[in-house]
Amino acid sequence: MTEITFKGGPIHLKGQQINEGDFAPDFTVLDNDLNQVTLADYAGKKKLISVVPSIDTGVCDQQTRKFNSEASKEEGIVLTISADLPFAQKRWCASAGLDNVITLSDHRDLSFGENYGVVMEELRLLARAVFVLDVDNKVVYKEIVSEGTDFPDFDAALAAYKNI
């Protein structure tokens, strides 16, 4: 998919598309304390990567809460990645009262977005998407939501995550 819609208007996705069965490419993002983080930092764990345009919107807030609530019952790790500033992500976590949520910022280089094909070119934000990786970083599930303001398929993503 190289085009989605956002609020009904066409948006072009930039970056390298990855597919189920591929090994996930590395990326460099920042945590809430401005520390550099890469995929290798989560080696040996299954991962549910929830990608949101902005943590400060209602749909993104609900997506982050749902995946963290449901997937945290399993062994593994849940990462929420957006192009928000780390300060905004930290503030959101504090105001939401969520201490165990891992939010990562791709604002600096869009490394994650470029390597996973989810940069919304016209907006310089990340498209709503979900990637599930096994312990070897093989992509076992991928969804790029076709309308950026819609929810992902929670049931399908969580089933893929639980079945690893």
Curated annotation (Swiss-Prot):
Reactions catalysed according to its record:
a hydroperoxide + [thioredoxin]-dithiol = an alcohol + [thioredoxin]-disulfide + H2O
Q: Which SUPFAM superfamilies match?
A: Thioredoxin-like
* Keyword Disulfide bond among record annotations: yes
Check the record and name the PROSITE patterns matching this protein.
THIOREDOXIN_2 (PS51352), TPX (PS01265)
Give the intrachain disulfide bonds. Answer: 60-93
Q: Which UniProt keywords apply?
A: Antioxidant, Disulfide bond, Oxidoreductase, Peroxidase, Redox-active center
Instruction: Read off the InterPro entries from this record.
Output: Redoxin, Thioredoxin-like_sf, Thioredoxin_domain, TPX, Tpx_CS, Tpx_Peroxidase_subfamily
Record-linked PANTHER family = THIOL PEROXIDASE (PTHR43110:SF1)
What remark does the entry add?
The active site is a conserved redox-active cysteine residue, the peroxidatic cysteine (C(P)), which makes the nucleophilic attack on the peroxide substrate. The peroxide oxidizes the C(P)-SH to cysteine sulfenic acid (C(P)-SOH), which then reacts with another cysteine residue, the resolving cysteine (C(R)), to form a disulfide bridge. The disulfide is subsequently reduced by an appropriate electron donor to complete the catalytic cycle. In this atypical 2-Cys peroxiredoxin, C(R) is present in the same subunit to form an intramolecular disulfide.
Instruction: Describe the task this protein carries out.
Output: Thiol-specific peroxidase that catalyzes the reduction of hydrogen peroxide and organic hydroperoxides to water and alcohols, respectively. Plays a role in cell protection against oxidative stress by detoxifying peroxides.
Q: Which HAMAP family match?
A: Tpx
Q: State whether it acts alone or in a complex, and with which partners, per the record.
A: Homodimer.
State the name under which the record lists this protein: Thiol peroxidase
Supply the source organism's classification: Bacteria, Bacillati, Bacillota, Bacilli, Bacillales
